[in-house]
Curated annotation (Swiss-Prot):
Residues 2-112 form the Thioredoxin domain. Participates in various redox reactions through the reversible oxidation of its active center dithiol to a disulfide and catalyzes dithiol-disulfide exchange reactions. InterPro entries: Thioredoxin-like_sf, Thioredoxin_CS, Thioredoxin_domain. Disulfide bonds join C30-C33. It comes from the Eukaryota. It comes from Fusarium culmorum. This is Thioredoxin-like protein. Belongs to the thioredoxin family.
């Protein structure tokens, strides 16, 4: 399940209440954003773990303060967070552009970490 974020406060609450979060900063008018949206939905369905790994979408035109806070200059931009702090996954803290292979690999990595956390490892 993808969390559709409507305010920066809502984003901050998700970041503080969930161990790992993948955030997709997008715009409705952005063709690459539309192209990767189904992939992002599939990754969310496959890897989401309640309170451990969440996938969120932030529309940069509607939640401008969040876009500014994280320095979003291109869409889509994907960022990864652990315990509220931005982190690198597979050596990348940010993925700019619709790159399904890199995004999929990052989701797989976080999904594995989330499963280990649930298992108590």
């Amino acid at each position: 399940m993808v969390h559709h974020i409507t305010s920066n406060d809502e984003l901050q609450k998700l970041l503080s209440s969930t161990t790992y979060v993948v955030v997709d900063f997008f715009a409705d008018w952005c063709p690459p954003c539309k192209a990767i949206a189904p992939v992002y939905e599939q990754l969310s369905t496959k890897h989401s773990v309640p309170d451990v790994l969440a996938f969120a979408k932030v529309n940069v035109d509607h939640v401008q303060d969040a876009a500014q806070q994280y320095g979003i200059t291109a869409m889509p931009t994907f960022m990864f967070f652990k315990e509220g702090k931005q982190v690198a996954v597979n050596g990348q803290a940010v993925i700019k552009g619709a790159d399904p292979r890199t995004l999929g690999a990052a989701a797989e990595k976080l999904g594995g970490l989330a499963q280990k956390r649930v298992a108590g490892a």
